[in-house]
C-alpha cells in the first residue's frame, strides 16, 4: 500500500442529545441542513476539495442512516481504490475493543487502520459543523511552523467562549494554554475541533492516554492539555470564514435561517469549494397556481400549493392549499395538509401535519429555546391540533 502523506479521521458517532427529537432516530451528522445537505456533507466536501482522498468515518450511535447515505463515498469523489472512504464502527477484537469511550479513544481503537496507510500527518475532524475550509492550506501552515499539533481556531463572541475549548497563544501563534469549556475563559479564540497531528506524536499521546485510568479519553479535556504540559509544539491556525457549531436547537435553526442570506447561498454553490451531497435524485419542484414563495429555499421533489415565507424546505415536502409556512424548516418528505399555520417550527423527516393545525402559536411570557417549536421525525399531528411556540413534540399527539 502506497504511503499517504495525510489521511482524515472524521468523528461522526455522536448522538447530539441537545438536538432533542431531531436525533431520536439518526446521529447528528446525518441531520438534514439547508434543504439539500446532511451536516456531514461539509466535512466530506472539505476533504474532497482539499485533495485528501483517504477518510475514516467513525460511527457509533444509530449508524444505519449515515452509513447508507455515505455508501461508497462517490458523491464526494472519495471512492478511489488506493484510499477512499471507510466506515469504522466500534468493534471487539481478541484483546481489545468496546464502545468508543471518547474522541481520543475512538482514534486509538482504529490505530490499525491508520498504520495501514502509515501517514506522516493525521487530520482529525468533527462531522457536525457547518463550514468550508481548505485543509491543504492548514497542512501547509502546520509544516511551515514545524508544529507537532495544529488546531484550527476561530474568534467567537466572548459571551459564547465558555461553550468551546479556548486557547491562549503567543505572537507567533504558538499555543501557551488550552482549556476545554472554561467557566471564565481567558480568550475568545475557540477550537473548531479540527486538528492536524504528526502521526508519531499522536500515536504516542493516544497510547499514553489509554493507560491513564483518570482520563475521559477526550482530545480537548485530556490529550491536548497533556501535550502542552510536555512542552510539545502546538499552534493555532486562525480561520476567518463562516463556521457554525449546530449542536443545539437554537444554533441549528439560526444556521439554517442564515442560509437564506444571498451571499451564503452563493457560497454553497461556488465551484471552487462546492459542497457535495448524496441527495436522492427527484423530479423538479411543482408550484401550484395559488402558491406564493418569498425568500425561501425549496428542494427538489416538493409540491407547494400554499404560501412559504422565509423558510427552508427540504426535498420531497408537500404543502397543501391555504397553508402558511413562516420562518420554518421542513425536513425531507414531511407533509403539511390544508389550512395549516406553521411559525418558527422545525418539522422532522416524514412527519405529517393534518389540516387546520396551528403550530408555533404565541404564548404568554418568554418561550423556551427562543420560541422554536420542534416536531420529531415520523410523527403524525392530528387535524385541528394547536401547539404553542417552544414546545418539543417527541411522540404522536393522538
Curated annotation (Swiss-Prot):
CDD domains: ADP_Glucose_PP, LbH_G1P_AT_C
Listed Pfam families: Hexapep_GlmU (PF24894), NTP_transferase (PF00483)
PROSITE patterns referenced in this protein's UniProt entry, alphabetically: ADP_GLC_PYROPHOSPH_2, ADP_GLC_PYROPHOSPH_3
Coiled-coil region: none
UniProt GO BP: glycogen biosynthetic process
EC number annotated for this UniProt entry: 2.7.7.27
Keyword match Ribosomal protein: no
Protein role: Involved in the biosynthesis of ADP-glucose, a building block required for the elongation reactions to produce glycogen. Catalyzes the reaction between ATP and alpha-D-glucose 1-phosphate (G1P) to produce pyrophosphate and ADP-Glc.
Binding partners and assembly: Homotetramer.
HAMAP family linked: GlgC
Family in the record: Belongs to the bacterial/plant glucose-1-phosphate adenylyltransferase family.
Protein name: Glucose-1-phosphate adenylyltransferase
Species, as recorded: Desulfitobacterium hafniense (strain Y51)
Amino acid at each position: 500500500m502506497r504511503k499517504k502523506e495525510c489521511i482524515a479521521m472524521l468523528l461522526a458517532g455522536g448522538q447530539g442529545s441537545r438536538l432533542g427529537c431531531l436525533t431520536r432516530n439518526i446521529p447528528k451528522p446525518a441531520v438534514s441542513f439547508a434543504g439539500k445537505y446532511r451536516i456531514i456533507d461539509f466535512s466530506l466536501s472539505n476533504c474532497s476539495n482539499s485533495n485528501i482522498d483517504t477518510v475514516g468515518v467513525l460511527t457509533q450511535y444509530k449508524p444505519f442512516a449515515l452509513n447508507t447515505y455515505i455508501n461508497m463515498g462517490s458523491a464526494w469523489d472519495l471512492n478511489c481504490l488506493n484510499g477512499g472512504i471507510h466506515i469504522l464502527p466500534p468493534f471487539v477484537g481478541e484483546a481489545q475493543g468496546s464502545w468508543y469511550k471518547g474522541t481520543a479513544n475512538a482514534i486509538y481503537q482504529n490505530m490499525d487502520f491508520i498504520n495501514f496507510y502509515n501517514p506522516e500527518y493525521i487530520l482529525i475532524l468533527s462531522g457536525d459543523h457547518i463550514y468550508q475550509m481548505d485543509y491543504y492550506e492548514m497542512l501547509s501552515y502546520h509544516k511551515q511552523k514545524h508544529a507537532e499539533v495544529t488546531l484550527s481556531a476561530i474568534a467567537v463572541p466572548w459571551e459564547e467562549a465558555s461553550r468551546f475549548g479556548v486557547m491562549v497563544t503567543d505572537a507567533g501563534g504558538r499555543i501557551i494554554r488550552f482549556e476545554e469549556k472554561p467557566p471564565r475563559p481567558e480568550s475568545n479564540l475557540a477550537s473548531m475541533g479540527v486538528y492536524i497531528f504528526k502521526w508519531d506524536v499522536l500515536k504516542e499521546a493516544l497510547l499514553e492516554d489509554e493507560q491513564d485510568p483518570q482520563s475521559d479519553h477526550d482530545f480537548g479535556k485530556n490529550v491536548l492539555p497533556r501535550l502542552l504540559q510536555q512542552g510539545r509544539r502546538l499552534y493555532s491556525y486562525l480561520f476567518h470564514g463562516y463556521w457554525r457549531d449546530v449542536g443545539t436547537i437554537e444554533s441549528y435553526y439560526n444556521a439554517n435561517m442564515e442560509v437564506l442570506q444571498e451571499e451564503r447561498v452563493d457560497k454553497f454553490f461556488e465551484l471552487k469549494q462546492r459542497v457535495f451531497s448524496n441527495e436522492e435524485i427527484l423530479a423538479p419542484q411543482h408550484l401550484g397556481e395559488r402558491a406564493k414563495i418569498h425568500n425561501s429555499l425549496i428542494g427538489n421533489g416538493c409540491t407547494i400549493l400554499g404560501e412559504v415565507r422565509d423558510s427552508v424546505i427540504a426535498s420531497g415536502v408537500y404543502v397543501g392549499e391555504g397553508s402558511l409556512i413562516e420562518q420554518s424548516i421542513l425536513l425531507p418528505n414531511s407533509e403539511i395538509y390544508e389550512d395549516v399555520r406553521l411559525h418558527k417550527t422545525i418539522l422532522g423527516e416524514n412527519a405529517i401535519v393534518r389540516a387546520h393545525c396551528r403550530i408555533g402559536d404565541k404564548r404568554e411570557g418568554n418561550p423556551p429555546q427562543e420560541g422554536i417549536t420542534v416536531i420529531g421525525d415520523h410523527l403524525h399531528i392530528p387535524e385541528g391540533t394547536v401547539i404553542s411556540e417552544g414546545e418539543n413534540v417527541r411522540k404522536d399527539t393522538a
